[in-house]
Amino acid sequence: PYGMQSSDRSRRLTVGITNVSTLGGYRLGNQLLFDTALAKKSWTYGDQWNVNSWVQRDFGHDLSFSARLHYKSQQSINGRDVSIMAPVQTANPDNYGGQVVDFAVGMSVASNMFGGNHEKIGMELVLPVKQNKRGLQMESNWSFILGYEITL
């Protein structure tokens, strides 16, 4: 099935713009990303738009909290891979893509886990707000993101 492929093996272009500003003790951010296949193979994942808006509040140097709203719109798969012809819904290119709106809350805390002075550990809980997926796709549930950052 297409969802189990590591890539569509196409040359892709991702362009975006990010704006971050400060208002009082808050950081406000917006980001727009567009992803498309330039050199298409027999099949490619559909064009994708991502829009993120967030607010972040720092509490001292070591702790921050954030809230984020994310919108994603992805077209269905273009083309067909003749080696993916199993009689299952995941082999149908029309069962991919759609629109999703997520809401996330997160926190970031300074750390010296590996002895550095500029390390952070971040975590974010992502909850689906609205899902309009194409074809026969399972609804998404919550997800948890854990990240580590080091600034050199």
State where each predicted segment sits:
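Outer-membrane pore/translocation modules
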Residues: 1-37, 90, 95-98, 151
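Outer membrane beta-barrel transmembrane domains
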Residues: 40-45, 49-152
